[in-house]
Amino acid sequence: MRKTAVFSAKKLSLIGLAAAATCILGPLSIPIPVSPVPITLTNLVILLNIYILGYHEALTCLFVYLALGIAGLPVFSGFSGGLGKLAGPTGGYLIGFIFLVLIAGFFIDRFPSSSLFAALGIILGMTATYGFGTLWLTAQMDLSLPEALSIGVLPYLAGDAMKILLATLTGPRLQKRLAQFQ
């Protein structure tokens, strides 16, 4: 009996390319003075990866990105890497991306023709990411919950709303365009 591969060569290539895109865009960040959490494009790239790959493969891609960062490659915000970055104040948001992929990916894959459900899934996934990251930030910096929310969530809401809009508008188009190559 012949076993089939978990991922086809094409899927592995797409996962590799998506991981590379995440590693290239992930370090680009804008520090803001009121917070240890910078503005990044990482969550947008992750959302587009869900559309392009589907959420199982996007989760694999995310784990590749996190593993490379933990191994010390400078793929996290500000061209940083290492286990210390994951264990630091912003590590909860990096780990929280797992929830983003699982929740948003479920909605995007389950309701492929509904941008409303996709947006709902992305909002729920971002909320879970914010929740985990904020609790982590609270513990790491010995902050109250309102303090952590004011530096770890509030400054990012408008930008993340734009990223959600951009992902829900461009994601399906990318998905359709790249489907012909899969």
PLM segments and residue spans:
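Generic alpha-helical transmembrane segments of integral inner-membrane proteins
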Residues: L12, G16, A20, I24, ...
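Interfacial aromatic-anchored transmembrane helix boundaries in multi-pass membrane proteins
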Residues: G26-P38, L66-L100
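Structural signal for the C-terminal ends of transmembrane alpha-helices
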Residues: I52-L53, I103-F111, L174-L178
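Alpha-helical transmembrane segments and their cytosolic interface
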Residues: M1-L17, I151-Q182
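Interfacial helix-loop-helix junctions of multi-pass membrane proteins
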Residues: L73-F79, W136-S150
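Membrane-helix interface segments
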Residues: S8-K11, Y55-T60, F111-F117, S144-L145
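Hydrophobic transmembrane alpha-helices
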Residues: M1-L59
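Short helix-perturbing small/polar motifs within transmembrane alpha-helices
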Residues: R2, S13-L17, I24, L83-A128
